Amino acid sequence: MRQILIAVAIALTVSILLTPALIRLFTRQGFGHHTREDGPPTHHAKRGTPSMGGVAIIAGIWAGYLGTHLAGLAFDGEGISASGLLVLSLATVLGIVGFLDDLIKIRRSRNLGLNKTAKTIGQVAAAVLFGVLALGFRNANGLTPASADLSYVREIATVTLAPGLFVLFCVVVVSAWSNAVNFTDGLDGLAAGSMAMVTAAYVLITFWQYRNACVTAPGLGCYNVRDPLDLAIVAAATAGACIGFLWWNAAPAKIFMGDTGSLALGGIIAGISVTSRTEILAVVLGSLFVAEVSSVVLQILTFRTTGRRVFRMAPFHHHFELAGWAETTVIIRFWLLTAIACGLGVALFYGEWLAAIGA
């Protein structure tokens, strides 16, 4: 538990202190946000707000993770793991893709960055590399960072993917989550606050997996996850970094995370869900993100097939704004829905464990 607290504290401190420095730097450089021309009228006032704040989030996560392991040397903590590094590397590569996207938007003075092909290639390349490496790095107990078995709370042994299909599955998971968080990041603090809750839920889940690992505590209900404690540290560092960033990103935002942050955070959910064997449970925990990206897909498909729109604007948080809800009202209500979803997800996880031990 000490590792978890240290990760949160370091990540939060780095993020909350680095963000205002980035605000000053990006303001001097003219790295301002460009709003959608067809967006809600109230959003035009946000034009010029510094973007690319995701740099502070990524830096905070890495600082929290590495700082925790350095501190761990003092009380004989577990070392850096393949699972932790894979998740963080995936998030960082996606963050670089997002950074390039943000930079191009700024240079062009338009809300159009990397073209869809280039952005997709970057996401797919990151996912393929992650998927290939996740089936390697077998430890002394024969466990790899990921399992080719499809997983809900633990592996579903009846659904095993061939290596090639598993890599393809990773492409779908990584692309879906990175785009889902990206679409959610349209209101001040919405994505950062929601991510803090989802990763906090993952701290509880992965730490419970660590306390009930088959390697150290064999028996009914144990978990075959390679590095659950390290995943808990990654999740804790992410929650801390998001909270620190939220201090400056809450309405009215002084800075936006941009695609730099949203793509990286989507990579965190994708990476942790795969390495903790909870890909299906993640859909419950991150149901707000799922709903946001689904609203975009539904809007596009419906308009192309019928010529009509389901929502006044997608992602659907804009629909509620145009329906008359204040931005802060949408944010707080969506945070409440995320908290409920996370509570439900943790309850399902714990309930499955109780069922497994016959309680």
Swiss-Prot record:
Principal location: membrane
Primary enzyme class: transferase
Pathway annotation from the record: Cell wall biogenesis; peptidoglycan biosynthesis
Matches recorded under PROSITE patterns: MRAY_1, MRAY_2
Key words, A-Z: Cell cycle, Cell division, Cell membrane, Cell shape, Cell wall biogenesis/degradation, Magnesium, Membrane, Metal-binding, Peptidoglycan synthesis, Transferase, Transmembrane, Transmembrane helix
EC number, UniProt record: 2.7.8.13
Keyword presence, Cell wall biogenesis/degradation: yes
Keyword match Membrane: yes
Name the UniProt record assigns to this protein: Phospho-N-acetylmuramoyl-pentapeptide-transferase
